Design a protein with these regions (language model features):
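RNA-recognition motif
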Residues: 52-59
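Helix N-cap motif at beta-to-alpha junctions
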Residues: 66-73
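Short glycine-/aliphatic-rich beta-strand segments at the starts of folded cytosolic domains
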Residues: 9-29
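Short amphipathic alpha-helix segments
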Residues: 28-49
Length: 115
């Protein structure tokens, strides 16, 4: 009896860096989380938990989300599809992906993105 080799493997993680453009003001974590939740439901009809989506770091304009590695493309699509946060029109530009928070922070934010 052969088992598929990917069974029992723990999920691998990806972190995606992004920048909110098109507006001067910064946003709250909860407003960005809400926009991500709504967009995920709108596009895929699923919950953010299904993709492992979590806002890990965010400073009002720049942030980092977590997802399971098999959903990296979908996660990027969700971020880039968001065009409103609250009542503000925005664009979200993804700036990099990595398997660790530390290397994404170094590569995409010069190590400056705090919790």
């Amino acid at each position: 009896l052969l088992l598929a080799s990917n069974q029992n493997k723990k999920p691998r993680h990806r972190y995606i860096g992004f920048i909110i453009t098109g507006v001067e003001k910064g946003f709250s974590r909860s407003a960005v989380n809400k926009a991500i939740r709504e967009e995920t439901l709108k596009i895929f009809g699923k919950k953010t938990e299904d993709f492992g989506l979590k806002l890990i770091r965010f400073n009002g304009k720049e942030g980092m989300i977590h997802c399971f590695h098999i959903y990296k493309t979908e996660a990027i699509h969700i971020l880039q599809s968001i065009n409103k946060i609250g009542k503000e029109n925005v664009r979200i530009k993804t700036v990099g992906t990595s398997g660790t928070i530390k290397s994404l922070n170094k590569k995409s934010f010069k190590g400056k993105l705090e919790r």
